Amino acid sequence: MKTPIELKILDSRIGSEFPLPAYATPGSAGMDLRAMIDTTLTIAPGETVLIPTGIAIHVADPGLAAVILPRSGLGHKHGIVLGNLVGLIDSDYQGPLMVSCWNRSDSPFALEIGDRLAQLVFVPVVQAQFKLVDEFDSSDRGEGGFGHSGTK
C-alpha cells in the first residue's frame, strides 16, 4: 500500500545531483535522508550539529506520522547517532526536515555533501483518550518495573 505524502524540494540539488528519497528495495521500511550541506562538515567528538536534508514534507493524514531514525552503519562504525535519538514529524508539520547528528565517538567525523545520514519512516498514529480509574484490572505483570521480567 502506498500513501501519497506531499514533498517540497528546498535544495535544487535534490532530483538533479542527488535522488529524491526512495525505498531501496520492496521490503525497505525507510527512505534515506541526505546531508544537503555546502561543504564537507567535520563533526568533532561530542559535538551535535543540525543538518538540513533539503526537503520538507506534509503528511496531512492525522492517522500517520513520520519518524527520523539513525542509519545503523553510521552509529556502529563511526559513532554518529541522532542527537535527539529519534525525530517525530507530526502530520500537520510543513517545515524543513533537519537531522540532529551527535558524534559520540572519540574521533572527528567528516560528513560529505549528499551523504546518507538518517532514514525517514512513516508510522500509524493512534490518539488516545484517557479514561480515569481508581484501580487497574489485575495483570500478570502488575507493577513490576525495570528488569522485572528477567533475562531468561
Curated annotation (Swiss-Prot):
**Gene Ontology molecular function:** dUTP diphosphatase activity; magnesium ion binding
Query: Known InterPro entries for this protein?
Result: dUTPase, dUTPase-like, dUTPase-like_sf, dUTPase_trimeric
Q: In which pathway does it act?
A: Pyrimidine metabolism; dUMP biosynthesis; dUMP from dCTP (dUTP route): step 2/2
Q: Which Gene3D superfamilies match?
A: 2.70.40.10
The enzyme's E.C. designation:
3.6.1.23
- Which superkingdom is the protein from? Bacteria
Recorded catalytic activity of this chain's protein: dUTP + H2O = dUMP + diphosphate + H(+)
* One Pfam family in the UniProt entry: dUTPase
Q: Which co-factor is required?
A: Mg(2+)
- Keywords on this record? Hydrolase, Magnesium, Metal-binding, Nucleotide metabolism
Annotated residues for binding of substrate:
R71, S72, G73, N84, L88, I89, D90, M98
**Some GO term, biological process aspect, for this entry: which one?**
dUMP biosynthetic process
Q: Which family does it belong to?
A: Belongs to the dUTPase family.
Q: What does this protein do?
A: This enzyme is involved in nucleotide metabolism: it produces dUMP, the immediate precursor of thymidine nucleotides and it decreases the intracellular concentration of dUTP so that uracil cannot be incorporated into DNA.
Q: What's the protein called, per UniProt?
A: Deoxyuridine 5'-triphosphate nucleotidohydrolase
Specify the species: Shewanella baltica (strain OS185)
